[in-house]
């Protein structure tokens, strides 16, 4: 279920404070955060966030299209290595030939 409109978007206080400080000083340094749940606000556009994915920090450069989404959406937590059809076909024994 979506968040109520009357409540407004959620963003951690410490994260919004870091962005406001960066905007005041015109600094574009990487902002490190564990807050994957924070909604990307219009103030975040143009900044790079290092979002923690459980193992390492993934750099996320925020653009206008990302506003309204969560930071965690852009830092995947799982790595998919793919299904290998060739290995399965080679390992599977075929019918016995006479």
UniProtKB/Swiss-Prot annotation:
Protein's organism: Anaeromyxobacter dehalogenans (strain 2CP-C)
Segments crossing the lipid bilayer: none
Superkingdom as given in the UniProt entry: Bacteria
Leader sequence segment: none
GO molecular function: rRNA binding; structural constituent of ribosome
GO-annotated cellular components: cytoplasm; small ribosomal subunit
Known function: Protein S19 forms a complex with S13 that binds strongly to the 16S ribosomal RNA.
One Pfam family this sequence matches: Ribosomal_S19
Alphabetical UniProt keywords: Ribonucleoprotein, Ribosomal protein, RNA-binding, rRNA-binding
InterPro entries: Ribosomal_uS19 (IPR002222), Ribosomal_uS19_bac-type (IPR005732), Ribosomal_uS19_CS (IPR020934), Ribosomal_uS19_SF (IPR023575)
Protein known as: Small ribosomal subunit protein uS19
Biological process (GO), any one: translation
Upper lineage: Bacteria, Pseudomonadati, Myxococcota, Myxococcia, Myxococcales
Renumbered residue ranges of the record's region Disordered: 1-30, 78-98
